[in-house]
């Protein structure tokens, strides 16, 4: 059963018969008080209540917050602005009130197949972050249609428009009156629904950790058996000692405080091409692995499934790596536990903050510390040349990491995205976790509210919030069209956030993304089409097409990566598929 109305005011009957809605639009002023965000303690949950105390008091909501609306009549999905309508005025709009400008967005109805008798929630998704400190507003116009005709303003909203708020909502009338005036000044007249909220920075949890993070001084490495492993001279694994903020290896204290040290995983790969190489001649690459994976999945498989072994060999690059805590294979049980008990969400996101801290610590250990003096490196490492290469999760959290360090100047972010709460439902990886969540939170509407709230936990590790830091950086996003794990729409959102330019020839030009031609520099975006279908249009897990993985062995991808991460002349984006876009039938020619 849905919880009672929020913000300290239960539903009350107005003398005119108008009542506040059981679920006010989220986010909005109804979910805030004078101190900031004010989520109620009785949010839907399984065993563990949602830890709203970690969120309440924040000055505003996420820059990439999904709005959730419980419309009282069945809506016609054809009347909603979809992904093909981005940038055109539509029945549902998102506005940056401070800038006086629309924000790219789309709207959709929750497509979960078993709604248990509920009407699907109307979801409004930003496709670019709203600037921190600004106010955002969702506007629904008379162009919205129900299944039986034009949609009408909800009675509670019509009452506010008339200046006669429902009983219990008198304190909100002044804010709505001001909102109506702001919208009218922007040329938005007579909406059938409108609500606004403040936007604030959610990155402090990570920034505070990194501000205290020290450079590690201790590590250990032991040789790995590399028999039968191609492109390999030697490998080592072990750990390094890094600062930790996790209490009992679970989550952070409130507020977060450094909690001693812990051992972080360490992997070292030396390619066969370095046999007999001159001293101090090998660039050092930091590798970011994919979701529910490990560095070994990319560096210790004989079939080289992601082409990383061959790539490192052709680059003549030493590769070092650690794990993304929270979303690495050894932590998979944590993610599953969150699925069964959504109130434990910080167990996942705090670990991922720790994972970014560990990766940053590894970079510092290599660049500023003494790691490369270890005999396992055979004196081969060039201590002046560092690069980053991240795949999937490594492309997502790699963007966060690079935004927070200047020790690595050039990075390739392969099949990465942003906007975690929008991205996950569309991923083929989501299916098992959705089963866990639906077993404990049965209401689809309540789940959509929780998914949107979860973005507040994701914010510290969401690259969309670091677009300004990446806007002048030498980074390259490589997108696989129709990606079944990281929806393309979240990659385009990241490109807008960072001002990355799309390098043509390309498959399609996303709205609001500028184009350029090669050769160029970052921040940049390139596209590779495995011809395995288009990006899904609804919030359901993608079928497993392997589009996410397919381009990794293409020469067009490999040569572009090697060129961008070149040890002596890095940061140049080139196109290696001739006059046409790179596709499965035009994957690029070898040098």
Residue map of PLM features:
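Primarily recognizes the serine-hydrolase "nucleophile elbow" in alpha/beta-hydrolase
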Residues: 367, 372-425
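Alpha/beta-hydrolase-fold catalytic nucleophile elbow
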Residues: 323, 414-415, 478
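N-terminal cap/lid segment of alpha/beta-hydrolase-fold proteins
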Residues: 222-282
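C-terminal catalytic histidine-bearing segment of alpha/beta-hydrolase fold enzymes
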Residues: 475-486, 492-591
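Serine-hydrolase catalytic core
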Residues: 403-406, 420-423, 428-529
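Cap/lid segment of the alpha/beta-hydrolase catalytic domain
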Residues: 248-263, 278-369, 375
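Ser/Thr-rich, Pro/Gly/Ala-heavy low-complexity intrinsically disordered linkers and tails
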Residues: 1-19
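Acidic, low-complexity Ser/Thr/Gly/Pro-rich repeat segments typical of extracellular/periplasmic
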Residues: 17-243, 247
């Amino acid at each position: 059963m849905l919880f009672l109305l929020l913000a300290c005011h239960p539903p009350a009957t107005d003398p005119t018969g108008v009542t506040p809605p059981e679920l006010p639009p989220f986010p909005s002023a109804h979910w805030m008080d004078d101190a900031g965000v004010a989520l109620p303690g009785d949010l839907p949950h399984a065993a563990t209540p949602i830890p709203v105390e970690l969120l309440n008091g924040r000055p505003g909501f996420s820059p990439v917050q999904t709005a959730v609306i419980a419309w009282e009549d069945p809506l016609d999905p054809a009347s909603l602005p979809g992904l093909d309508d981005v940038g055109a005025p539509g029945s549902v709009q998102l506005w940056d009130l401070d800038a006086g400008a629309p924000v790219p967005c789309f709207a959709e109805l929750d497509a979960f197949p078993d709604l248990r008798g509920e009407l699907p929630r109307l979801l409004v998704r930003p496709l670019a972050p709203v600037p921190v400190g600004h106010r955002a507003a969702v506007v629904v116009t008379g162009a919205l249609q129900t299944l039986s005709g034009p949609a009408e303003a909800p009675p509670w909203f019509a009452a506010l428009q008339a200046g006669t708020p429902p009983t219990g909502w008198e304190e909100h009338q002044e804010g709505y009156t001001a909102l109506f005036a702001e919208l009218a000044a922007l040329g938005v007249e007579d909406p059938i629904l409108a609500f606004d909220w403040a936007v604030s920075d959610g990155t402090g949890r990570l920034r505070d950790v990194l501000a205290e993070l020290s450079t590690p001084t201790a590590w250990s490495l032991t040789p790995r058996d590399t028999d039968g492993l191609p492109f390999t001279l030697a490998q080592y694994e072990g750990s390094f000692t890094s600062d930790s903020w996790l209490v009992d290896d679970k989550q952070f204290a409130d507020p977060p405080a450094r909690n001693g040290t812990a051992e972080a995983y360490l992997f070292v790969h030396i390619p066969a091409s370095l046999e007999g190489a001159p001293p101090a001649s090998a660039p050092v690459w930091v590798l970011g692995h994919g979701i529910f994976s490990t560095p070994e999945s990319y560096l210790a498989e004989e079939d080289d499934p992601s082409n990383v072994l061959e790539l490192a060999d052709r680059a003549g690059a030493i590769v070092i790596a650690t794990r993304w805590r929270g979303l690495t294979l050894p932590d998979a049980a944590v993610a599953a536990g969150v699925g069964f008990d959504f109130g434990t969400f910080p167990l996942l996101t705090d670990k991922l903050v720790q994972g970014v801290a560990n990766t940053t610590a590894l970079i510092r250990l290599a660049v500023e510390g003494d790691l490369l003096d270890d005999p396992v490196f055979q004196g081969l490492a060039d201590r002046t040349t560092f690069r980053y290469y991240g795949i999937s999760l490594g492309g997502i959290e790699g963007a966060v990491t690079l935004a927070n360090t200047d020790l690595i100047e050039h990075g390739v972010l392969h099949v990465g995205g942003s906007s975690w709460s929008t991205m996950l439902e569309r991923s083929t990886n989501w299916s098992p976790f959705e089963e866990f969540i639906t077993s404990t939170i049965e209401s689809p509407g309540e789940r959509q509210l929780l998914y949107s709230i979860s973005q507040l936990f994701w914010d510290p590790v969401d690259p969309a919030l670091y677009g300004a830091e990446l806007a002048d950086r030498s980074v390259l996003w490589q997108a696989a069209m129709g990606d079944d794990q990281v929806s393309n729409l979240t990659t385009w959102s990241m490109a807008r956030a960072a001002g990355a330019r799309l390098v043509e020839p390309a498959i399609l030009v996303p709205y609001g993304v500028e184009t350029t031609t090669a050769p160029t520099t970052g921040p940049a975006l390139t596209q590779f089409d495995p011809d395995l279908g288009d990006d899904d249009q609804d919030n359901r897990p993608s079928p497993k097409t392997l589009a996410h993985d397919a381009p990794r062995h293409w020469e067009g991808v490999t040569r572009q990566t090697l060129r961008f991460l070149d040890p002596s002349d890095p940061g140049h984006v080139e196109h290696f598929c001739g006059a046409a876009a790179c596709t499965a039938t035009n994957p690029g020619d070898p040098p």
